[in-house]
Amino acid sequence: MSKQRLQQNCVIALAVLMSWAAAAEPPEPIPVKVVVVTMFEVGADEGDRAGEFQLWKERRNLTKTFPFMGYRDLYLDPEKGLLVLVTGIGTARSAAAIMALGMDPRFDLTKSYWVVAGIAGIDPEDASIGSAAWAEYLVDGDLSHEIDAREIPEDWPFGYFARYTKRPFDVDKPAPTGEMYQLNTGLVNWAFAQTKNLTLPDTDAHAKAHRALYTDHVNAQRPPFVLKGDHVAALTFWHGALMNDWANQWVDYWTQGRGEFVSSAMEDTGTYLSLSWLNRVGRVDVSRLLVLRTASNYTMPPPGVTAAENLLAENKGYSGLAIAVESAYQVASTVVDQLIVGWAVYENQLPGAVDQKDLP
Protein backbone atom coordinates (compact mmCIF):
# COMPACT_ATOMS: atom_id res chain seq x y z
CA MET A 1 0.00 0.00 0.00
CA SER A 2 1.34 3.43 -0.93
CA LYS A 3 2.16 5.97 1.72
CA GLN A 4 -0.47 8.35 0.29
CA ARG A 5 -3.17 5.66 0.41
CA LEU A 6 -2.22 4.79 4.00
CA GLN A 7 -2.55 8.42 5.01
CA GLN A 8 -5.98 8.62 3.37
CA ASN A 9 -7.16 5.52 5.24
CA CYS A 10 -5.90 6.94 8.53
CA VAL A 11 -7.77 10.19 7.93
CA ILE A 12 -10.99 8.28 7.13
CA ALA A 13 -10.62 6.09 10.22
CA LEU A 14 -10.00 9.13 12.41
CA ALA A 15 -13.07 10.87 10.99
CA VAL A 16 -15.21 7.80 11.70
CA LEU A 17 -13.92 7.58 15.27
CA MET A 18 -14.60 11.27 15.84
CA SER A 19 -18.15 10.95 14.53
CA TRP A 20 -18.74 7.97 16.83
CA ALA A 21 -17.41 9.94 19.79
CA ALA A 22 -19.64 12.88 18.94
CA ALA A 23 -22.66 10.61 18.64
CA ALA A 24 -21.86 9.03 22.01
CA GLU A 25 -21.73 12.37 23.82
CA PRO A 26 -24.96 13.09 25.69
CA PRO A 27 -26.82 16.24 24.68
CA GLU A 28 -26.40 19.35 26.78
CA PRO A 29 -28.94 19.43 29.63
CA ILE A 30 -31.84 21.81 29.11
CA PRO A 31 -31.71 24.79 31.50
CA VAL A 32 -34.99 25.17 33.38
CA LYS A 33 -36.03 28.48 34.93
CA VAL A 34 -39.14 27.36 36.81
CA VAL A 35 -40.49 23.93 37.77
CA VAL A 36 -44.20 23.92 38.60
CA VAL A 37 -45.01 21.00 40.90
CA THR A 38 -48.56 19.65 40.78
CA MET A 39 -49.70 16.52 42.56
CA PHE A 40 -52.62 14.99 40.67
CA GLU A 41 -54.90 15.10 37.67
CA VAL A 42 -58.51 13.89 37.68
CA GLY A 43 -58.70 12.24 34.25
CA ALA A 44 -57.11 13.22 30.96
CA ASP A 45 -54.53 15.97 30.68
CA GLU A 46 -56.92 18.17 28.71
CA GLY A 47 -60.58 18.65 27.97
CA ASP A 48 -62.34 17.21 31.02
CA ARG A 49 -62.74 18.07 34.69
CA ALA A 50 -59.54 19.79 35.76
CA GLY A 51 -57.19 18.66 38.48
CA GLU A 52 -54.05 20.54 39.45
CA PHE A 53 -52.17 19.94 36.18
CA GLN A 54 -54.76 20.44 33.45
CA LEU A 55 -54.92 24.25 33.35
CA TRP A 56 -51.14 24.41 32.90
CA LYS A 57 -51.40 22.01 29.96
CA GLU A 58 -54.26 23.90 28.35
CA ARG A 59 -53.03 27.46 28.89
CA ARG A 60 -49.27 27.20 28.58
CA ASN A 61 -47.07 26.50 25.60
CA LEU A 62 -46.00 23.06 26.88
CA THR A 63 -45.05 21.82 23.44
CA LYS A 64 -42.37 19.33 24.41
CA THR A 65 -43.09 16.08 26.23
CA PHE A 66 -40.46 14.02 28.03
CA PRO A 67 -41.19 10.41 29.02
CA PHE A 68 -40.78 10.12 32.77
CA MET A 69 -40.76 7.05 34.98
CA GLY A 70 -43.15 8.65 37.43
CA TYR A 71 -46.83 9.43 37.77
CA ARG A 72 -47.08 11.24 34.40
CA ASP A 73 -44.77 12.53 31.70
CA LEU A 74 -42.98 15.87 31.99
CA TYR A 75 -44.07 18.88 29.93
CA LEU A 76 -41.82 21.76 28.89
CA ASP A 77 -42.24 25.20 27.37
CA PRO A 78 -38.80 25.35 25.71
CA GLU A 79 -39.03 29.07 24.94
CA LYS A 80 -39.68 30.19 28.51
CA GLY A 81 -37.88 27.40 30.35
CA LEU A 82 -41.01 26.29 32.21
CA LEU A 83 -41.26 22.62 33.22
CA VAL A 84 -44.43 21.13 34.76
CA LEU A 85 -44.45 17.94 36.85
CA VAL A 86 -47.20 15.75 38.34
CA THR A 87 -45.82 13.90 41.37
CA GLY A 88 -48.72 11.71 42.45
CA ILE A 89 -50.46 11.94 45.83
CA GLY A 90 -48.64 11.47 49.15
CA THR A 91 -45.23 12.28 50.60
CA ALA A 92 -43.71 9.03 49.31
CA ARG A 93 -44.69 9.74 45.70
CA SER A 94 -43.73 13.40 45.86
CA ALA A 95 -40.33 12.60 47.36
CA ALA A 96 -39.66 9.92 44.74
CA ALA A 97 -40.80 12.07 41.81
CA ILE A 98 -38.78 15.11 42.88
CA MET A 99 -35.67 12.98 43.42
CA ALA A 100 -36.11 11.33 40.00
CA LEU A 101 -36.46 14.70 38.29
CA GLY A 102 -33.59 16.21 40.25
CA MET A 103 -31.23 13.46 39.09
CA ASP A 104 -32.50 13.47 35.48
CA PRO A 105 -29.51 14.28 33.21
CA ARG A 106 -31.80 15.80 30.59
CA PHE A 107 -32.31 18.95 32.67
CA ASP A 108 -30.14 21.60 34.30
CA LEU A 109 -32.02 22.52 37.49
CA THR A 110 -29.20 24.28 39.31
CA LYS A 111 -30.85 27.72 39.02
CA SER A 112 -34.47 26.57 38.86
CA TYR A 113 -37.23 27.93 41.06
CA TRP A 114 -39.71 25.33 42.27
CA VAL A 115 -43.34 26.40 42.69
CA VAL A 116 -45.71 23.90 44.29
CA ALA A 117 -49.23 24.75 43.09
CA GLY A 118 -51.82 22.45 44.61
CA ILE A 119 -55.09 22.25 46.50
CA ALA A 120 -55.51 21.64 50.23
CA GLY A 121 -57.84 21.62 53.17
CA ILE A 122 -58.11 25.02 54.87
CA ASP A 123 -58.65 25.98 58.50
CA PRO A 124 -61.98 27.89 58.51
CA GLU A 125 -60.63 30.13 61.24
CA ASP A 126 -58.09 31.52 58.76
CA ALA A 127 -59.54 31.51 55.24
CA SER A 128 -62.30 30.41 52.87
CA ILE A 129 -62.47 27.82 50.12
CA GLY A 130 -60.90 29.20 46.96
CA SER A 131 -58.33 31.16 48.99
CA ALA A 132 -54.60 30.80 48.32
CA ALA A 133 -51.96 30.48 51.06
CA TRP A 134 -48.19 30.87 50.68
CA ALA A 135 -46.42 28.75 53.31
CA GLU A 136 -43.18 29.59 55.06
CA TYR A 137 -43.19 26.56 57.37
CA LEU A 138 -43.87 22.96 56.31
CA VAL A 139 -44.65 20.70 59.26
CA ASP A 140 -44.81 16.92 58.94
CA GLY A 141 -47.87 15.28 60.46
CA ASP A 142 -46.53 11.72 60.33
CA LEU A 143 -43.15 11.71 62.10
CA SER A 144 -44.28 11.16 65.69
CA HIS A 145 -45.36 8.69 68.33
CA GLU A 146 -49.05 7.86 68.62
CA ILE A 147 -51.25 6.16 71.20
CA ASP A 148 -54.93 5.58 70.55
CA ALA A 149 -56.90 8.38 72.23
CA ARG A 150 -58.92 5.80 74.19
CA GLU A 151 -55.73 4.70 75.95
CA ILE A 152 -53.98 7.98 76.67
CA PRO A 153 -53.53 9.46 80.17
CA GLU A 154 -56.37 11.71 81.28
CA ASP A 155 -54.24 14.86 81.20
CA TRP A 156 -53.11 14.36 77.58
CA PRO A 157 -54.98 16.40 74.94
CA PHE A 158 -54.03 14.05 72.07
CA GLY A 159 -52.36 10.73 71.45
CA TYR A 160 -49.80 12.27 69.09
CA PHE A 161 -46.48 13.39 70.52
CA ALA A 162 -42.99 14.08 69.21
CA ARG A 163 -40.46 11.29 68.98
CA TYR A 164 -38.07 11.01 71.92
CA THR A 165 -40.38 13.00 74.20
CA LYS A 166 -42.57 11.96 77.14
CA ARG A 167 -45.93 13.57 76.36
CA PRO A 168 -47.72 15.79 73.82
CA PHE A 169 -46.02 19.15 73.36
CA ASP A 170 -43.15 18.30 75.69
CA VAL A 171 -40.88 21.35 75.71
CA ASP A 172 -37.87 19.07 76.03
CA LYS A 173 -37.94 17.98 72.39
CA PRO A 174 -35.00 17.30 70.07
CA ALA A 175 -34.18 19.54 67.13
CA PRO A 176 -36.36 18.72 64.11
CA THR A 177 -35.00 16.06 61.77
CA GLY A 178 -37.77 16.12 59.19
CA GLU A 179 -40.62 17.27 61.42
CA MET A 180 -40.41 20.88 60.22
CA TYR A 181 -38.83 22.77 57.33
CA GLN A 182 -38.61 26.54 56.88
CA LEU A 183 -38.65 28.04 53.39
CA ASN A 184 -36.74 31.15 52.35
CA THR A 185 -38.54 33.96 54.17
CA GLY A 186 -37.58 36.68 51.70
CA LEU A 187 -38.73 34.64 48.71
CA VAL A 188 -42.05 33.75 50.37
CA ASN A 189 -42.70 37.38 51.30
CA TRP A 190 -41.89 38.44 47.75
CA ALA A 191 -44.33 35.90 46.26
CA PHE A 192 -47.04 37.05 48.64
CA ALA A 193 -46.40 40.70 47.74
CA GLN A 194 -46.78 39.92 44.03
CA THR A 195 -50.15 38.24 44.54
CA LYS A 196 -51.84 39.63 47.66
CA ASN A 197 -54.10 42.00 45.71
CA LEU A 198 -55.28 39.50 43.11
CA THR A 199 -59.02 38.99 42.74
CA LEU A 200 -59.57 35.25 42.92
CA PRO A 201 -62.37 33.36 41.14
CA ASP A 202 -65.67 33.22 43.03
CA THR A 203 -68.31 32.08 40.56
CA ASP A 204 -69.17 28.65 41.96
CA ALA A 205 -72.63 28.66 43.56
CA HIS A 206 -72.00 25.41 45.45
CA ALA A 207 -68.81 26.81 46.99
CA LYS A 208 -70.61 30.00 48.04
CA ALA A 209 -73.40 28.00 49.66
CA HIS A 210 -70.91 25.84 51.54
CA ARG A 211 -69.00 28.89 52.80
CA ALA A 212 -72.20 30.35 54.21
CA LEU A 213 -72.60 27.36 56.53
CA TYR A 214 -69.53 28.34 58.57
CA THR A 215 -71.34 30.87 60.72
CA ASP A 216 -68.84 30.57 63.58
CA HIS A 217 -65.86 31.54 61.40
CA VAL A 218 -65.73 35.00 59.84
CA ASN A 219 -62.81 34.25 57.51
CA ALA A 220 -64.48 31.07 56.25
CA GLN A 221 -67.34 33.16 54.85
CA ARG A 222 -65.17 35.68 53.01
CA PRO A 223 -64.71 35.64 49.24
CA PRO A 224 -61.42 33.91 48.30
CA PHE A 225 -58.26 35.87 49.06
CA VAL A 226 -54.46 35.46 49.13
CA LEU A 227 -52.72 35.09 52.48
CA LYS A 228 -49.60 33.75 54.14
CA GLY A 229 -50.11 30.64 56.22
CA ASP A 230 -48.29 27.47 57.11
CA HIS A 231 -48.80 23.88 56.13
CA VAL A 232 -49.16 20.41 57.63
CA ALA A 233 -48.30 17.50 55.31
CA ALA A 234 -49.43 14.01 56.31
CA LEU A 235 -50.29 10.78 54.55
CA THR A 236 -53.53 10.55 56.53
CA PHE A 237 -56.42 12.65 55.19
CA TRP A 238 -57.70 13.81 58.56
CA HIS A 239 -60.80 15.89 59.33
CA GLY A 240 -62.66 17.38 62.28
CA ALA A 241 -62.51 20.07 64.95
CA LEU A 242 -60.29 18.03 67.29
CA MET A 243 -57.79 17.19 64.56
CA ASN A 244 -57.87 20.82 63.44
CA ASP A 245 -57.00 21.86 66.99
CA TRP A 246 -54.15 19.35 66.99
CA ALA A 247 -52.80 20.74 63.69
CA ASN A 248 -52.77 24.28 65.04
CA GLN A 249 -50.91 23.22 68.16
CA TRP A 250 -48.55 20.94 66.20
CA VAL A 251 -47.46 23.79 63.92
CA ASP A 252 -47.10 26.15 66.87
CA TYR A 253 -45.03 23.53 68.71
CA TRP A 254 -42.55 22.77 65.93
CA THR A 255 -42.17 26.39 64.78
CA GLN A 256 -41.80 27.66 68.36
CA GLY A 257 -44.76 29.98 67.93
CA ARG A 258 -43.60 31.52 64.66
CA GLY A 259 -45.90 29.54 62.37
CA GLU A 260 -49.67 29.52 61.93
CA PHE A 261 -51.47 26.43 60.66
CA VAL A 262 -53.61 27.28 57.64
CA SER A 263 -53.53 24.43 55.10
CA SER A 264 -53.36 20.64 55.13
CA ALA A 265 -52.30 18.30 52.32
CA MET A 266 -50.15 15.23 51.77
CA GLU A 267 -46.92 15.95 49.88
CA ASP A 268 -44.86 19.01 50.69
CA THR A 269 -42.48 17.71 53.35
CA GLY A 270 -41.56 14.91 50.94
CA THR A 271 -40.92 17.47 48.21
CA TYR A 272 -38.72 19.54 50.50
CA LEU A 273 -36.77 16.53 51.75
CA SER A 274 -35.77 15.43 48.25
CA LEU A 275 -34.84 18.96 47.25
CA SER A 276 -32.71 19.33 50.37
CA TRP A 277 -30.78 16.16 49.52
CA LEU A 278 -30.41 17.23 45.88
CA ASN A 279 -29.14 20.56 47.19
CA ARG A 280 -26.30 18.76 48.98
CA VAL A 281 -24.92 17.40 45.70
CA GLY A 282 -25.37 20.64 43.77
CA ARG A 283 -28.27 19.52 41.60
CA VAL A 284 -30.75 22.15 42.85
CA ASP A 285 -31.00 25.16 45.15
CA VAL A 286 -33.55 24.32 47.86
CA SER A 287 -33.78 27.98 48.89
CA ARG A 288 -35.68 28.56 45.62
CA LEU A 289 -38.74 26.55 46.70
CA LEU A 290 -42.19 28.13 47.03
CA VAL A 291 -45.30 26.32 48.28
CA LEU A 292 -48.75 27.59 47.33
CA ARG A 293 -51.85 25.77 48.53
CA THR A 294 -55.40 26.75 47.56
CA ALA A 295 -58.46 25.72 49.54
CA SER A 296 -60.71 23.06 48.02
CA ASN A 297 -62.37 22.13 51.34
CA TYR A 298 -62.36 22.92 55.04
CA THR A 299 -60.45 20.89 57.62
CA MET A 300 -63.44 20.75 59.98
CA PRO A 301 -67.23 20.74 59.59
CA PRO A 302 -69.65 23.66 59.97
CA PRO A 303 -71.92 23.93 63.02
CA GLY A 304 -74.51 21.17 63.26
CA VAL A 305 -72.62 18.70 61.05
CA THR A 306 -70.45 15.87 62.39
CA ALA A 307 -66.89 15.31 61.20
CA ALA A 308 -67.89 11.96 59.69
CA GLU A 309 -70.85 13.45 57.81
CA ASN A 310 -68.79 16.29 56.41
CA LEU A 311 -65.83 14.14 55.37
CA LEU A 312 -68.03 11.58 53.63
CA ALA A 313 -69.83 14.37 51.78
CA GLU A 314 -66.50 15.85 50.68
CA ASN A 315 -65.34 12.46 49.42
CA LYS A 316 -68.07 12.71 46.78
CA GLY A 317 -66.46 15.91 45.53
CA TYR A 318 -64.71 18.82 47.21
CA SER A 319 -67.01 21.83 47.54
CA GLY A 320 -64.33 24.20 46.29
CA LEU A 321 -62.33 22.05 43.87
CA ALA A 322 -63.05 24.05 40.70
CA ILE A 323 -62.26 27.46 42.17
CA ALA A 324 -59.26 26.09 44.09
CA VAL A 325 -57.72 24.70 40.91
CA GLU A 326 -58.34 28.00 39.13
CA SER A 327 -56.89 29.99 42.03
CA ALA A 328 -53.79 27.79 42.11
CA TYR A 329 -53.17 28.43 38.43
CA GLN A 330 -53.81 32.17 38.57
CA VAL A 331 -51.76 32.89 41.69
CA ALA A 332 -48.85 30.59 40.82
CA SER A 333 -48.82 31.88 37.23
CA THR A 334 -48.37 35.43 38.46
CA VAL A 335 -45.21 34.43 40.32
CA VAL A 336 -43.95 32.13 37.55
CA ASP A 337 -44.27 34.91 34.98
CA GLN A 338 -42.48 37.40 37.23
CA LEU A 339 -39.58 34.98 37.67
CA ILE A 340 -39.28 34.38 33.93
CA VAL A 341 -39.59 38.06 32.95
CA GLY A 342 -37.00 39.05 35.54
CA TRP A 343 -34.64 36.17 34.76
CA ALA A 344 -31.71 38.45 33.89
CA VAL A 345 -31.62 39.28 37.61
CA TYR A 346 -33.37 36.31 39.23
CA GLU A 347 -31.09 33.71 37.65
CA ASN A 348 -28.39 34.61 40.13
CA GLN A 349 -30.18 36.56 42.86
CA LEU A 350 -33.35 35.57 44.68
CA PRO A 351 -36.24 38.05 44.42
CA GLY A 352 -36.49 38.66 48.15
CA ALA A 353 -32.95 40.03 48.11
CA VAL A 354 -33.33 42.11 44.93
CA ASP A 355 -34.02 45.82 44.74
CA GLN A 356 -36.96 45.90 42.32
CA LYS A 357 -35.61 49.00 40.55
CA ASP A 358 -32.79 46.79 39.22
CA LEU A 359 -35.24 44.70 37.20
CA PRO A 360 -35.60 45.19 33.43
Go through each PLM region and give its residues.
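Bacterial N-terminal signal peptides that target proteins for export
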Residues: S2-V11
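Hydrophobic h-region of N-terminal signal peptides that target proteins for export
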Residues: A15-A23
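Generic secretory/membrane-interface signal
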Residues: S2-K3, S19, V262
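Accessory terminal and edge-of-domain segments that mediate assembly/interaction
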Residues: E25-P360
